[in-house]
């Protein structure tokens, strides 16, 4: 896991639902916690593009529902600014499920993937069809 090259606005608090855009069988996940988040007392953990989150599968196949999984956020609706001044935002909030070692659990990623997430997680970047 590498450091991010841009300052991504954190827009996904605990309880936010994300579309799961890989072929693991999960369709919708809900954020439980954010790995590596350092905040102040009573502040909710928030995640942004490229962050590792712990999530619960809310919709999907029968064997995937109610599973607690690790996931990487690859798209967010809230715009964020890159180092060159370009502002980036997507149509939805989306994530992909990964193993505890950081390897993509599925074999494909549907839709575009943010460049920040692909740089930080090489297995996600290699499976992506579109990088933005």
Swiss-Prot record:
Alphabetized InterPro entries for the sequence: Ribosomal_uL14, Ribosomal_uL14_arc, Ribosomal_uL14_CS, Ribosomal_uL14_sf
Gene Ontology BP annotations: translation
A molecular function (GO) term: structural constituent of ribosome
One Gene Ontology cellular component: cytosolic large ribosomal subunit
Keywords: Ribonucleoprotein, Ribosomal protein, RNA-binding, rRNA-binding
Annotated Pfam families: Ribosomal_L14
Disulfide-linked positions: none
SMART domains: Ribosomal_L14
Listed PROSITE patterns: RIBOSOMAL_L14
Stated role: Binds to 23S rRNA. Forms part of two intersubunit bridges in the 70S ribosome.
NCBIfam families to which the protein is assigned, alphabetical: PRK08571.1, uL14_arch
Quaternary state and interactors: Part of the 50S ribosomal subunit. Forms a cluster with proteins L3 and L24e, part of which may contact the 16S rRNA in 2 intersubunit bridges.
Family indicated by similarity: Belongs to the universal ribosomal protein uL14 family.
Name of the featured protein: Large ribosomal subunit protein uL14
Natural source organism: Methanobrevibacter smithii (strain ATCC 35061 / DSM 861 / OCM 144 / PS)
Gene: rpl14
